Every structure is written in C-alpha cells, then in structure tokens.
Amino acid sequence: KFLLFKTVLIKNFCHGAFFHNLSYLFLNRKNTPLEKLLWRIVSDGSERFDTHFDLAVSYIEGGSAYYVHDHVSAAKKAAFIHVDYVQAGYTRRLDKDCYVDFDRIFAVSDETAGVFAGVYPECQQKLSVFHNLIDTEAIRQKALLPAEKSMHEGIRLLTVGRLTPQKGFDCAVYALKLLLEKQYPVYWYIIGEGPE
C-alpha cells in the first residue's frame, strides 16, 4: 500500500493535480470506496501525450476510462464495461459523468449492460454488448484436467499479463517478499511475454 501511495503522490505532484485531487478525495471519502477514489486520482496523475488519435479505447472501467476521457485527445472514444457497475462501487459522481461523452460503450454481457444502463440511461443508444472472446467453458474444462507439470505444495499464486513496467510486477515482488518473510509457503507463477 505504501508503494502505491508513494507512486500516486509523485505522479500527482508531477502533473500539478495533487491539490485538486486532495479536495476531491476529502469530499468523496464517505460515500466511495478508497480504491475507487485512488483510481480517479491515479488517472489524473498519469503521463499525458500531445498526440491526437483517431480512436482511443478504455478497455476497462475506472481509472482507464477516466484517463481516456480526461487526458486523451481523440476523434472518437470508446469504453468497455466488464463488471456489475453498481456492485463494483462505481457512481456517476465518481465518474464525473465521463461515460456521457464516450462515442461507444461496450458491456461484456446483457446483465452488465442492463446495470450500466440503469445508471446511465442516456447512454442506451451508444451501449452495445460485446462478449469476451475467451471461451470460458473450454477454460473450465481444461482446469479439470491433471497438470502437465507438478506444482509446489502450499499457496500457489498465478499472474497472467504482459511483462512491462506499466503492469507493476516490481510491486508484486515486494509483496511476495513480505509473504515469504512471514513464513508463508508461497510460490508465484508468472505467465506472459514482454521486455521484463
């Protein structure tokens, strides 16, 4: 948590957003989960680009959507919603109504689209369902098969992702070190590709 907090502070000071976000955090702290507020603040402190794009896509709700909305210049903007919007703790106030300005919004299921449309009814015309391209049933079936390699006993953690600095694997290494120092029998498996 300290490393994340330190990163948030540095980024917000670099982009001059610290004092603006401090008041935002203070005003919204009672009605919004802290992790949601931190994503709003992190998006305001993130790197900015002078490039104008034809299309900008926020592939996940929260900080990604806030960043694309507030800090990316693009002719068209699209957003994906992967979660039950209300259950996940998002609100229009937290979003600062950013989804109203997106040109297209894609939900990953009919249920997800329905919940989102309940919060943003005026976005109904630009809201579509775009199912995940992953065959979840095939994954469930493969999970039942015996492992090809023997796995360590104890707590097994699996991380799947692109191995780049932006993904923050360096932070995860510190977390793993803390678990090992506390004598937890933890084994961390990483699947991915990239420069790290």
Describe each model-derived feature in a short phrase:
Residues 35-45, 65, 82-101:
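Nucleotide-sugar donor phosphate/pyrophosphate-binding loop at the beta->alpha transition
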Residues 134, 160, 187-196:
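Glycosyltransferase donor-sugar binding loop
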